[in-house]
């Protein structure tokens, strides 16, 4: 397809595109809408919205104060208040943001290259595992990415002040969204050659407008809490401990992989590199178009800014932090295929298929459950375990770790009807199991689960493992069988799904709990 051909999508406005894209996204995510909340959703984002809805506090009271701006929590609180405290309500609300983001991706790509590349880019972005999963999760990263992509589109259209409004909304969704305006300000100041030096300074100053609402939020947070950022533990984990040159170097390597290789993105990166060896395809109207080089350089600068910022800051190397950059990578890749491959639709379709496969098949390296549909396995296993506890352990104190501690104490998260008394450990490593055994008299039941996905590395390096443990929280959970032997307990419920597992151990002598467990799942039954 060439851009000289008439395409009905050339005339589609935002008002016509957004409902169409939202309906498609909704249908793709329909099987996931009723899942209870997962990991950081349960640990912060939903409780923060709960606090805002019930105590009208912009700063979280009943959960960790991360210092994040309040727009994302306010958005969720609005939908919860209007439609009720149900996970499906939040997921549909997030799909609206995903549809908004994808609509801006389409309009941006159509303006820069044409409708054919716009369709390919939008479809590939929608099914790219990391973006797909985040589309229905309540993390602030999706809202920040949606407004950031809107701002980038308006910026490339020359609509300077509307773009700053979009970036301001992005910054009020999550403070790290300031990365893109800073990158564009740097572009205007150092690399944009049109206009005088004074003109470049003025444009750079305009690009820095989103700093103002961020400063206002930080001032409010300081006035309210006495801190500019989140609580001491959160700040230490995400900033103080991260400021290490060796950690930065190691994180930069992993961040580069996350952006250009993770979750089958390597296929598109390789295809893009291979296509560069071919000359541009020439038709009756000349060479096929490409994204203008200055715009590509702006995109590269935005990508580089994300890589550097999230290598320097942030305790966990979560791929969702790079969410605004992924559509830019995909757009450049699809544009390159379109420009240099005659029948470019075939490799573009292959990339989409490869991304879809990444949703269902785990990669042969370590990854987070939220990078593909493994998170669904995690949630479903935890839901089954919570229901077992409700049926058979109502009067017991439970030993477990986060996020199960929130799942079992906050009924609005969708796991339990009433809270359980808990004893908390950090994880289920050998060290924590020793602590658990020392606290043996304080609990009757242990609820264990996989806190990390342990995939055997391609090349085993003890030094690399030590560095991962030191800087990135890597650890190995003991198996349910080892934990049962160590804690002198009996496994009364055990379920697995690929790399994820949950186990419930009864600490007392054989009792009615063990006998009723046999009716529920069989003695030491494994549910696949």
Model feature map: region roles:
Residues 141, 170-173, 179-180, 258-269, ...:
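Hydrophobic/aromatic-rich transmembrane helices and adjacent perimembrane loops
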Residues 104, 124-127, 143-162, 166, ...:
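Specific aromatic-rich, kink-prone transmembrane helix
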Residues 28, 201-273, 302-309, 313, ...:
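Membrane-lumen/periplasm interface segments of specific transmembrane helices
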Residues 22-26, 118-129, 149, 153, ...:
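Short helix- or helix-capping micro-motifs
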Residues 19, 23, 92-112:
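Transmembrane-helix motifs of polytopic, lipid-linked glycan transferases
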Residues 2-7, 179-211, 281-286, 331:
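Perimembrane helix-loop-helix junctions
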Residues 18-22, 165, 207-211, 265-271, ...:
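Signature aromatic-anchored transmembrane alpha helix within multi-pass, membrane-resident enzymes
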Residues 155, 347-413, 419-420:
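Membrane-embedded, lumen/periplasm-facing catalytic core of multi-pass transferases
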């Amino acid at each position: 397809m060439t851009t000289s051909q008439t395409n009905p999508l050339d005339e589609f406005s935002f008002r016509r595109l957004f409902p169409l894209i939202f309906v498609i996204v909704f249908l793709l995510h329909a099987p996931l809408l009723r899942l209870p909340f997962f990991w950081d959703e349960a640990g912060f984002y939903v409780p923060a919205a709960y606090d805002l809805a019930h105590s009208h506090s912009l700063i979280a009271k009943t959960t960790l104060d991360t210092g994040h701006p309040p727009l994302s929590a306010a958005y969720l609180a609005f939908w919860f208040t209007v439609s009720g405290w149900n996970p499906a309500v939040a997921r549909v609300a997030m799909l609206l943001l995903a549809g908004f983001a994808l609509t801006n991706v389409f309009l941006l790509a159509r303006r820069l290259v044409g409708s054919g590349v716009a369709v390919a880019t939008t479809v590939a972005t929608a099914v790219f595992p990391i973006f797909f999963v985040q589309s229905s999760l309540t993390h602030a990263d999706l809202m920040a990415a949606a407004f950031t992509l809107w701002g980038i589109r308006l910026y490339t259209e020359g609509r300077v002040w509307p773009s700053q409004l979009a970036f301001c909304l992005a910054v009020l969704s999550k403070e790290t969204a300031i990365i893109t305006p800073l990158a564009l300000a740097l572009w205007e100041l150092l690399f944009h050659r049109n206009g005088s030096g004074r003109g470049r300074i003025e444009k750079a100053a305009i690009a820095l407008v989103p700093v103002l609402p961020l400063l206002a939020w930080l001032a409010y947070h300081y006035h309210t809490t006495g801190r500019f950022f989140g609580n001491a533990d959160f700040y230490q984990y995400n900033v103080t401990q991260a400021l290490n040159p060796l950690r930065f170097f190691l994180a930069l390597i992993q961040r580069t992989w996350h952006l250009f290789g993770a979750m089958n993105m390597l296929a598109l990166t390789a295809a893009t590199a291979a296509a560069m060896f071919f000359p541009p395809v020439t038709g009756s109207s000349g060479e096929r178009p490409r994204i203008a080089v200055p715009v590509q350089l702006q995109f590269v600068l935005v990508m580089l800014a994300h890589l550097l910022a999230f290598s320097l800051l942030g305790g966990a190397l979560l791929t969702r932090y790079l969410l605004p950059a992924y559509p830019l990578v995909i757009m450049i890749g699809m544009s390159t295929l379109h420009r240099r491959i005659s029948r470019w639709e075939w490799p573009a379709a292959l990339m989409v298929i490869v991304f879809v496969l990444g949703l269902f098949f785990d990669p042969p390296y370590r990854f987070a459950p939220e990078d593909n549909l493994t998170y669904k396995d995690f949630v479903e296993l935890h839901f089954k375990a919570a229901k077992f506890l409700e049926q058979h352990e109502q009067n017991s104190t439970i030993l477990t770790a986060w996020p199960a501690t929130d799942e079992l104490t906050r009924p609005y998260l969708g796991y339990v009807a009433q809270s359980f008394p808990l004893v908390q450990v950090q994880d289920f490593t050998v060290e924590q199991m020793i602590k658990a055994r020392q606290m043996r008299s304080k609990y009757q039941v242990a609820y264990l689960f996989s806190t990390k996905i342990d995939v055997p590395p391609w090349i085993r390096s003890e030094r690399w493992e030590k560095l991962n443990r030191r800087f990135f929280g890597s650890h190995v959970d003991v198996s349910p069988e080892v934990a049962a032997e160590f804690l002198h307990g009996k496994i009364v419920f055990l379920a697995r799904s690929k790399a994820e597992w949950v186990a419930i151990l009864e600490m007392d002598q054989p009792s009615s709990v063990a006998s009723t467990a046999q009716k529920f799942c069989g003695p030491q039954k494994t549910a696949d």
